[in-house]
Design a protein with these regions (language model features):
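Conserved phosphate-handling catalytic cores of large alpha/beta enzymes
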Residues: 116-166
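Phosphate-handling DNA/RNA-contact segment within nucleic-acid enzymes
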Residues: 1-131, 144-145
């Protein structure tokens, strides 16, 4: 099927440039973002090479299908393992989820970076109320972990903090 430039833009795959419309994800590894049923709703992309002043990751902008505050990466793959184990491990990044699943640890999902929301925890609470948070041990990860505690309390889930030595 052929898509119009407007349809591509509305899907969050292109951006307006000074010379017209351009590929938003050029020079990046694209990772599909899927909803809880496994349908692609957006993309995140990581730089393949370091580029000065360029963000390491970019996401599809907010669209009708993709809402960063509600999205839980990997949930469609992890939900059966979460039900069986009766807990979920919540990590920062998509690549953390991919690595965990490759190693056979399947009850792992991610937020969009450190931006944990009530909506993320409510989505996870449909499968378990035992949330095990394992954010990175850097400043951003520690700050996000501290922000997560009152959010978990408000949602009414049990939150444990896991730390991995650096």
């Amino acid at each position: 099927r052929k898509f119009t430039a407007e349809e591509i833009k509305q899907a969050g795959l292109s951006a307006q440039r000074y010379r017209g419309t351009g590929d938003m994800f050029r020079g990046r590894l694209m990772i599909p973002l899927q909803d809880a049923q496994g349908r692609v709703v957006g993309f995140t992309a990581r730089l393949l090479k370091d580029v000065k002043d360029a963000p390491k990751y970019i996401n599809t902008p907010q669209t009708l299908l993709y809402d960063k505050s509600r999205h839980v990466y990997g949930l469609h793959l992890a939900k059966d393992a979460i039900r069986r184990s009766q807990f979920v491990v919540l990590v920062e990044g998509n690549l953390d989820v991919i690595s965990s699943h490759q190693a056979g640890v399947r009850q792992v999902v991610a937020t969009a970076g450190t931006a944990l929301t009530e909506q993320n925890l409510k989505a996870l609470s449909r499968f378990t109320d035992d949330i095990r948070l394992c954010f990175d041990a850097d400043r951003a990860g520690i700050a996000a972990t501290e922000r997560a505690i009152p959010i978990a309390s408000k949602v009414g889930v049990s939150l444990s903090i896991l730390t991995i030595p650096s």
